[in-house]
UniProtKB/Swiss-Prot annotation:
It comes from the Bacteria. GO terms for molecular function: N-acetylgalactosamine binding; oligosaccharide binding; polysaccharide binding. InterPro entries: Galactose-binding_lectin, H-type_lectin_dom_sf, H-type_lectin_domain. Transmembrane segments: none annotated. This is ATP synthase subunits region ORF 7. GO terms for biological process: cell-cell adhesion. One of its GO terms (cellular component) is phagocytic vesicle. SUPFAM superfamilies: Agglutinin HPA-like.
Amino acid sequence: MLRLGASVGVHQGSRILFSDFADGGQMWTGNGPREYRLDVTFPEPFTRTPAVTVGLSMWDMDHKTNSRMDIGAENITPQGFQIVFKTWGDTRIARVRADWLAIGSVRDDEDWEIE
């Protein structure tokens, strides 16, 4: 975790979500659910729910169909979140890579608890 000051931390990552053209998966064929979810667990948890952003860093698609997609973060907790990628209609997607960034409060060495 990168620390920005005493009590703010940053986690970041990059993941290939799917590669459906190789095996005729649902995002490529257009059959079945057109949603993919990936659980991300932070290597070190935050002390509170962080702010998380998700973006596309690679999008390989069929040029003969419309380009439609929605990507975001859901179910965010101090321990992790889900990347959610969706498409619809005639869109055919071969593969997608998503990058993410989480910023939030972390435990400081100077923190102490009173019981």
